[in-house]
């Protein structure tokens, strides 16, 4: 279901001068020993970003997952870009989270970087649900204007493709425009905050249970700490 999203993101990254990087051995792809499920991941070197990861899980009609996180260079205090899309085919259920993930919740910081996401939040009302995500504190590393939906086929087929394209454009625009604005957070603190994001997320990642059920505990633990959130590896 999410191949078009994957292709669009990879096309954008390539046009921006991105080049693929090697993943830790054995983590670029895994096939389930119990089913036809397969998970593939990519790591990109993109100008202006220190790390951009992408993951696609195909478990047929039962589950489809698309996930990506972009980490700006430490010289930029820009928000991270986070995408989580899950489709449960048997239940015809969509869970979608698209966010510019703030390093801090300071008003000046939010005013500086979130006008584009605020506009999208208004433009796509069926993706600005008020329901709080259950696994995370919305006041940490999430914005008040994230596009969030627990919906069905209508949102998956109609709203989400348009919202995803607009979301990517808004994030690229944020990055391009903000490069000319001096960061207010020094690089060493940006690194510290990005590391804390990894640690925080690894402790709460709801997808870890899904990966474990499909690909086993050992592989999924490596995937969590070595690829998804590598700064968490020293805090296991």
From Swiss-Prot:
It catalyses: 15,16-dihydrobiliverdin + oxidized 2[4Fe-4S]-[ferredoxin] = biliverdin IXalpha + reduced 2[4Fe-4S]-[ferredoxin] + 2 H(+). It comes from the Bacteria. One of its GO terms (molecular function) is 15,16-dihydrobiliverdin:ferredoxin oxidoreductase activity. Keywords: Oxidoreductase. The keyword Transferase does not apply. Signal peptide: none annotated. Gene3D superfamilies: 3.40.1500.20. GO terms for biological process: phytochromobilin biosynthetic process. Pfam families: Fe_bilin_red. InterPro entries: DiHydbiliverdin_OxRdtase, Ferredoxin-dep_bilin_Rdtase. Its EC number is 1.3.7.2. HAMAP family: PebA. PANTHER family: PHYTOCHROMOBILIN:FERREDOXIN OXIDOREDUCTASE, CHLOROPLASTIC. Belongs to the HY2 family. Catalyzes the two-electron reduction of biliverdin IX-alpha at the C15 methine bridge. This is 15,16-dihydrobiliverdin:ferredoxin oxidoreductase. It comes from Synechococcus sp. (strain WH8020).
């Amino acid at each position: 279901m999410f191949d078009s999203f994957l292709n669009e993101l990879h096309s954008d990254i390539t046009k921006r001068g991105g080049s693929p990087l090697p993943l830790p051995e054995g983590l670029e792809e895994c096939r389930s020993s119990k089913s036809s499920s397969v998970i593939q991941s990519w790591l990109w070197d993109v100008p202006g970003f220190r790390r951009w990861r992408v993951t696609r899980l195909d478990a047929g009609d039962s589950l489809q997952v698309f996930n990506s996180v972009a980490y700006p260079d430490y010289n930029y205090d820009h928000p991270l870009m986070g995408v989580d899309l899950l489709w449960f085919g048997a239940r015809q259920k969509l869970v979608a989270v698209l966010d510019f993930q703030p390093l801090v919740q300071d008003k000046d910081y939010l005013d500086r970087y979130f006008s584009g996401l605020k506009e999208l939040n208004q433009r796509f009302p069926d993706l600005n649900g008020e329901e709080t995500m259950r696994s995370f504190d919305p006041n940490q590393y999430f914005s008040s204007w994230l596009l969030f939906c627990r919906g069905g086929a209508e949102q998956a087929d109609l709203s989400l493709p348009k919202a995803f394209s607009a979301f990517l454009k808004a994030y690229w625009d944020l990055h391009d425009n903000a490069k000319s604005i001096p960061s207010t957070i020094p690089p060493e603190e940006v690194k510290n905050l990005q590391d804390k994001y990894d640690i925080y997320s690894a402790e709460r990642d709801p997808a870890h249970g899904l990966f474990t059920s499909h690909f086993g505990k050992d592989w999924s633990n490596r995937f969590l700490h070595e690829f998804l959130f590598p700064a968490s590896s020293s805090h296991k």
